[in-house]
């Protein structure tokens, strides 16, 4: 396992003799015994000149250390709701090393969360994430208020965050109880995110903390405290440090062009439209997944928790939150099986080493696997309770129906930069299909073709390796599979629950072919894969079967390409999703939309680097 991987350990709590929730890990209380709500307002809001500083702003970003019970977030949210002059959008980025489980938070909400904040806490509880390491984006007020929870050790998390922060709430357990959180190096790595005029506030006035904040580039003052605090500390970014600060970005006022209307383009367009942007989607085909009955969205695990596993985990979580309530998406669960007993044992060992929560993934023996599937299966494996069965084209149609999205039929052949930084998207005849300052190429294997014709591919050797890979699935009558499995069964191939009386079985990989089409040879390979998962041949299936064939855009390493072209302002890529278009769709859309709109990014910087265009 990678030495960088650290399992996420939930909070261990108890209620002390005074009735306050305390951490057994650190021996300190979560909330101020005097007045937790009042301290949140006096120290963190007023200490950062809030709400005055967000007035007249399109968006405002806060970064917090020590989420705990969410008291500071809830107080900030309440102040925003009550302020008629509030900013358009409010973002909080909060780091928590030992989060409470959903059950633990629910158990203490009515006794430990201050009464004025409990209504907000119940909304927070409804979105409480699975306790998985990484970033979790929660949205409130129809997306106008976002909370990005960064779960993990602050020493690992802080260097991987990307944001332009207006105010810091430095909370958490006392420096004497949890010195690692107040380490000078950690503070420096965190406070680098501050804008040129960023402020900070904290309830502690410990000398080494104040010195660390000064070393991190802040002018520090110790002020008289209140509500049980003798002194508090506030600060403003020093002029010398502000020269190196990240620059604020406001959302584009003009429309954004998205080239491609498949899973990549639809996810991108929806993410932009949700933020109030106008989007023009240009695509040749109105039904790129027509006839594709169903597909599976499942995470994956790797013993070293590598970039692909982390991205798949983040993508599946993002999709689940973004697509809830859509008719095209159904949570059915997913079994992941290996091809033999030896590989199964290795998979079980991997799961044990990673310490993921059982409500996200757990090991099941063959008997339980059969109960979950409702069919005989070859062996036990991993069970992901949140596995999603998706009808791809209805999902795409639902995403592209979002207000603010305009669809245009046409095939973009090249991009041309014209005056004032505008990009024109031209077809093969030179006709202008759209014009914008920001263009996202989300057209799968067509991406390198457009870049090459535009003179932009040369500096991108990785993108130049992108190619199309054919594949097909077979549609098996559900009656031939006892009505079909109750959950998705995957491994080397997959068998999906019935949709409209058919079970999708797949899939093939056919490199080097000129045409992707349904074939008897492909059907045979798919049925063989299904037999390997179910432990027996599909004898009830006879004759040619219907199916669906398409193309995957893939690159070496099986990772997508995501981000702005280096040195080329306004051209973005969201492509090479391969077999995991459902995994990357919502996440990639949010990453690029967040970058365009100046939000904290919902993905760690090392993962962004792994999928960058260069």
Swiss-Prot record:
> Where are the stretches annotated tRNA (mnm(5)s(2)U34)-methyltransferase?
1-238
In terms of InterPro entries, this protein maps to:
FAD-dep_OxRdtase, FAD/NAD-bd_sf, MnmC-like_methylTransf, SAM-dependent_MTases_sf, tRNA_MAMT_biosynth_bifunc_MnmC, tRNA_MNMC2, tRNA_S-uridine_synth_MnmC_C
Region feature FAD-dependent cmnm(5)s(2)U34 oxidoreductase, mapped onto this chain: 259-614
Coiled coil regions in record: none
- What Enzyme Commission number does this protein have? 2.1.1.61, 1.5.-.-
Q: Where in the cell is it found?
A: Cytoplasm
* A single Gene Ontology CC term: cytoplasm
MF-aspect GO terms: flavin adenine dinucleotide binding; oxidoreductase activity, acting on the CH-NH group of donors; tRNA (5-methylaminomethyl-2-thiouridylate)(34)-methyltransferase activity
The chemistry this enzyme catalyses reads: 5-aminomethyl-2-thiouridine(34) in tRNA + S-adenosyl-L-methionine = 5-methylaminomethyl-2-thiouridine(34) in tRNA + S-adenosyl-L-homocysteine + H(+)
Cofactor(s) required for function per UniProt: FAD
- What is the similarity comment for this entry? In the N-terminal section; belongs to the methyltransferase superfamily. tRNA (mnm(5)s(2)U34)-methyltransferase family.
Q: Which HAMAP family match?
A: MnmC
| UniProt-listed PANTHER family | SARCOSINE DEHYDROGENASE-RELATED (PTHR13847), TRNA 5-METHYLAMINOMETHYL-2-THIOURIDINE BIOSYNTHESIS BIFUNCTIONAL PROTEIN MNMC (PTHR13847:SF283)
Q: What does this protein do?
A: Catalyzes the last two steps in the biosynthesis of 5-methylaminomethyl-2-thiouridine (mnm(5)s(2)U) at the wobble position (U34) in tRNA. Catalyzes the FAD-dependent demodification of cmnm(5)s(2)U34 to nm(5)s(2)U34, followed by the transfer of a methyl group from S-adenosyl-L-methionine to nm(5)s(2)U34, to form mnm(5)s(2)U34.
Query: By what name is this protein known?
Result: tRNA 5-methylaminomethyl-2-thiouridine biosynthesis bifunctional protein MnmC
- Species in which this protein is naturally found: Bordetella avium (strain 197N)
What does the record give as the organism's lineage? Bacteria, Pseudomonadati, Pseudomonadota, Betaproteobacteria, Burkholderiales
């Amino acid at each position: 396992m990678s030495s960088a991987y650290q399992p996420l350990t939930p909070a261990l709590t108890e209620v002390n003799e005074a009735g306050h929730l305390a951490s057994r890990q650190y021996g300190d209380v979560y909330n101020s015994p005097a007045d937790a709500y009042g301290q949140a307002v006096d120290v963190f809001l007023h200490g950062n000149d809030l709400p005055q500083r967000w007035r007249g702003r399109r968006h405002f970003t806060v970064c917090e250390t020590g989420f705990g019970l969410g008291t500071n977030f809830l107080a900030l949210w309440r102040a925003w709701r009550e302020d008629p002059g509030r900013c358009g959008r409010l973002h909080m980025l909060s780091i928590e090393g030992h989060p409470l489980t959903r059950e633990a938070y629910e158990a203490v909400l009515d006794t430990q969360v201050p009464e004025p904040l409990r209504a907000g806490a119940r909304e927070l509880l409804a979105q409480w994430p699975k306790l998985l390491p990484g970033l979790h984006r929660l949205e409130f007020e129809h997306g106008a208020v976002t909370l990005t929870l960064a779960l993990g050790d602050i020493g690992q998390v802080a260097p991987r965050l990307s944001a332009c922060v207006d105010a810091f709430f430095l909370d958490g357990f006392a420096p004497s109880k949890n010195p690692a959180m107040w380490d000078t190096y950690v503070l420096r790595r965190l406070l680098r995110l501050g804008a040129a005029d960023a402020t900070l506030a904290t309830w502690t006035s410990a000398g080494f903390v104040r010195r660390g904040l000064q070393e991190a580039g802040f002018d520090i003052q110790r002020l008289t405290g209140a509500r049980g605090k003798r002194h508090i500390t506030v600060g403003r970014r020093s002029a010398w440090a502000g020269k190196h600060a990240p620059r604020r970005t406001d959302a584009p006022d003009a429309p954004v062009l998205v080239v491609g209307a498949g899973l990549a383009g639809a996810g991108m367009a929806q993410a932009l439209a949700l933020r109030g942007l106008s989007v023009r989607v240009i695509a040749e085909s109105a039904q790129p997944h027509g006839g594709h009955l169903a597909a599976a969205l499942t995470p994956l695990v790797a013993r070293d928790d590598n970039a692909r596993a982390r991205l798949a985990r983040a993508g599946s979580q993002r999709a689940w939150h973004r697509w809830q309530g859509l008719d095209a998406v159904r949570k059915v669960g997913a079994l992941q099986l290996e091809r033999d007993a030896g590989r199964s044992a290795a998979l079980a060992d991997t799961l044990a080493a990673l310490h993921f929560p059982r409500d996200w993934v757990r090991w099941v023996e063959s008997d339980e696997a059969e109960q979950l599937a409702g069919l005989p299966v070859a062996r036990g494996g991993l069970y992901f309770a949140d596995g999603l069965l998706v009808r791809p084209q209805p999902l795409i149609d639902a995403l592209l129906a979002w207000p603010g999205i305009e669809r245009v039929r046409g095939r973009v052949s090249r991009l041309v930069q014209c005056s004032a930084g505008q990009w024109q998207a031209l077809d093969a005849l030179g006709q202008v299909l759209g014009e914008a300052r920001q263009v996202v190429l989300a057209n799968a294997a067509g991406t390198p073709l457009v870049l090459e014709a535009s003179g932009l591919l040369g500096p991108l050797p990785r993108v130049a390796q992108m190619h199309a890979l054919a594949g097909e699935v077979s549609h098996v009558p559900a009656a031939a599979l006892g009505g079909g499995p109750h959950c998705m069964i995957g491994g080397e191939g997959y068998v999906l629950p019935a949709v409209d009386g058919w079970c999708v079985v797949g899939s093939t990989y056919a490199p080097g072919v000129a045409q992707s089409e349904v074939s008897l040879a492909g059907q045979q390979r798919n049925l063989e894969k299904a037999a390997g998962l179910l432990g027996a041949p599909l004898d009830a299936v006879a004759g040619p079967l219907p199916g669906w064939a398409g193309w995957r855009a893939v690159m070496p390493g099986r990772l997508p390409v995501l981000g702005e072209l280096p040195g080329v302002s306004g051209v973005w890529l969201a492509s090479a999703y391969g077999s995991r278009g459902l995994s990357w769709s919502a996440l990639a859309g949010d990453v690029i939309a967040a970058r365009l709109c100046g939000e904290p990014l919902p993905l760690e910087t090392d993962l962004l680097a792994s999928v960058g265009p260069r």
